[in-house]
Amino acid sequence: MEIDGGNDVQILDPELLQLPGLSPVSLKENPHIAEELFSQWLSLPETGRLVKSLIDDTKSSTPVSVSKNCTSLNVACGSALPSVFLNSGTPPLSPRGSPGSPRFSRQKTSPSLQSPLKSVREPKRQLIPQFYFQHGRPPAKELREQCISMVDQFFSNYIDGLHMDEFKSITKEVCKLPSFLSSVLFRKIDTSGTGIVTRDAFIKYWVDGHMLAMDVASQIYNILRQPGCKYLRQADFKPVLDELLTTHPGLEFLRNTPEFQERYAETVIYRIFYYINRSGTGCITLRELKRGNLITAMQQVDEEDDINKVIRYFSYEHFYVIYCRFWELDGDHDFLIDKENLIKYGNHALTYRIVDRIFSQVPRKFTSKVEGKMSYEDFAYFILAEEDKSSEPSLEYWFKCIDLDGDGVITPNEMQFFYEEQLHRMECITQEPVLFEDILCQIFDMIKPEKENCITLQDLKASKLSGNIFNILFNLNKFMAFETRDPFLIRQERENPTLTEWDRFAQREYVRLSMEEDVEEVSNGSADVWDEPLESPF
């Protein structure tokens, strides 16, 4: 609305604000009279000019000051206000006072006589430090200067830049990252593929790109992921494993066997995704990477020459066990196994019903493109779940198998369905059978579920004995070992309390496989070998 600021009215007519004389009581009982008075005041030309002036100041972003505009308005209005209450007994108090008040003066106007807009002071604005950074928090000044100083020292002898084989010292000493990430980081900076990383290019990526201020997990995550992706795929880890195989002294013996190098890299990646990718999507998020222990394992493997001492993910012995167990089951060596192959696992330890559930792809969809066949990756997930039932990924894997109707709980009927085959197998080998009613009581005593008639996944995760439940239901050999309290297993647990079930299994299996390989080498050896005395292993 356009406010007319013309000068047609030079003098304020006090009669415009005249109302009949009212007593204070009458005014209190009739509040609409005060509203009418305010409406009349708004209609005055002087008021219009004041409002227009304030609007113009606001539009022009200039400080709002109404002292000039309202001085004459105050005077004119002040002379008119007493006539409103001509017949009242006692004049009401006014914030502007009366003409006779010593506070009222043309020459000097106190703050209380000015516009209410002026009297309300704006609170001082407090400077809130920036807490969101679209590209990450920039590094502190001292950290930035320290990093640049180190970079200058490294590049002082390489004015034209560093080649890939010269870049490893930057990765390890400046970036504080595992050395086998060097080639991936190099290519991340050298986007044009020149084969050289200059000082300015490194500063732009590592310092100006705020990589310096990130935690190690975020740094590795951003180095490995593809542009535009918010997750890590299996292929993103392949260059890292390739460099590890090329540079790590503990894997040097594999350099002449590229096939086994490839299998080792695949197995490590499968183990990483089995434990880290808890959502099962095949894509590792930054949150999952931070929650897992992969970063610690990567740092450890970079410092340890003996790869087998890094039992998380990278142990060659663990790879050897997984690969050899798969190879034993894969009779035709087409790198695929079927139900009949898997039923032989662990000396026919598993029941047909649980194998059917696995091949129904209930716990996990197969990556194999051949129907009814399990690939090496699928087997890696299976063996990790079977031999480490105390881990959460394993509990989730087997819980899906036992939960026949997929309602999120395991009922006594579902447990009985799987235990029936166990009971039949015990009868076949003349083993004294254990009735299901007794087993059910034992299971509920071990788990102590929140509800009496069913078991949830959370109930299993809260109990340290959960793995035994699945052994009771579908693994006869482990069930018998649990019932007899195998002294060998008990002694092994006491000797290495920090090891997981998988670690102990891999340790035993590697010894067994090594002994079998030694025997095979002896049997295929020369006549000279047969002449040497052999000590009995027992």
From Swiss-Prot:
One of its GO terms (molecular function) is calcium ion binding. Residues 88-120, 519-538 are annotated as: Disordered. Keywords: Calcium, Metal-binding, Repeat. PROSITE patterns: EF_HAND_1, EF_HAND_2. One of its GO terms (cellular component) is mitochondrion. Residues 107-117 have a biased composition (Polar residues). InterPro entries: EF-hand-dom_pair, EF-hand_13, EF_Hand_1_Ca_BS, EF_hand_dom. Disruption phenotype: No visible phenotype. Residues 88-104 have a biased composition (Low complexity). Residues 177-212, 264-299, 390-425 form the EF-hand domain. This is Serine/threonine protein phosphatase 2A regulatory subunit B''alpha. It comes from Arabidopsis thaliana. The gene is B''ALPHA.
